[in-house]
Amino acid sequence: MTELSITGQQVMPPPACTPPEPFRITTNAPHQMNDASLTPGRRKLQKWLGRVLRIVITDGRVLVGFFNCTDRDANIVLSMCAEYLVEGQEPRLLGNVMVPGQHIVSLSIDEPDPQSSLLVQ
């Protein structure tokens, strides 16, 4: 099916919108790594990837965003991060943020585990 543009030329309609793909985890780790070769701590971190974390830092600010990665110094990278200065105030949207491990006071998962919920039909 074609449509006419303002100039009278025939144009194809845009393709149907498709829902976004689910969160995809990428890694540069060797492919032979499997779940059995991971330490319990690394296994837990892997489960947290893509989840929403709430991090309180030393100056009292609260950062909430999607957990992307960490390193050996406990630095954490969050995407789509929001900063909360005072409870009840509007958050400030920051985007991608690297939180130094030395400034992290507490860290928590801010959403329920999607795999732990049961769907009833």
UniProtKB/Swiss-Prot annotation:
Record-linked CDD domains: LSMD1
Localization, UniProt: Cytoplasm; Nucleus
Domain Sm: 40-113
Pfam families found in the cross-reference section: LSM
InterPro entries: LSM_dom_sf, LSMD1_Sm, Sm, Sm_dom_euk/arc, snRNP_SmB/NAA38-like
Keywords: Cytoplasm, Nucleus
One annotated GO molecular function: RNA binding
Domain of life assignment: Eukaryota
GO cellular component: NatC complex; nucleus
Other remarks on this protein: When it was originally identified as the potential ortholog of GEMIN7 this protein was named 'Sabbat' after the 7th day of the week.
Protein family per UniProt: Belongs to the snRNP Sm proteins family.
Described purpose of this protein according to its UniProt entry: Auxiliary component of the N-terminal acetyltransferase C (NatC) complex which catalyzes acetylation of N-terminal methionine residues. May have an accessory function in the survival motor neuron (SMN) complex.
Quaternary structure, from the entry: Component of the N-terminal acetyltransferase C (NatC) complex, which is composed of Naa35, Sbat/Naa38 and Naa30A. Interacts with Smn and Hez; along with Hez and Vlet, may form an accessory subcomplex involved in SMN complex function.
Name by which UniProt lists this protein: N-alpha-acetyltransferase 38, NatC auxiliary subunit
Species the sequence originates in: Drosophila melanogaster
